Amino acid sequence: MSDLAVERFVTFVVVIVHPDPSEVTIVNAGHMPPVWLRSADNTIVEPGQQESGLPIAIDSGMRYESVRCTIEPGDVMVLYTDGVNEAMNGNDEEFGMDRIRQLTAAGGDAQTITDRLVTAVRTFVSDTPPFDDMALVVIQRI
């Protein structure tokens, strides 16, 4: 076990896109899994959630599992930092992962989903100052 303070741990998710044969490999180190909108049936899946390991620097012997998934035309994947799902409003409520899932499930292309999420977070927090950085990456197979 590391002697680092809890706030010093780092989580991450790595998504490697393999254009041929249209697959992604996901490795998760204690991070929120990608929110993936499957275009074939409009379902939300979160690959890498079961395979998530500990944040880095907690256990120097930690071995991380990868998961490989096929990405179909029209599929959209949302990756985000905890500053997005943990964004707080004036009532001390978190934006939450459920909102991210719901807003992604509403569909659209990568730009539409990006715009929807950014607008929703900005509206939710209103004039409450952010306590953490926020990053959002939305990718789509065309």
Regions flagged by a language model, labelled:
Residues M1-I142:
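Conserved subregion of the PPM/PP2C metallophosphatase catalytic domain
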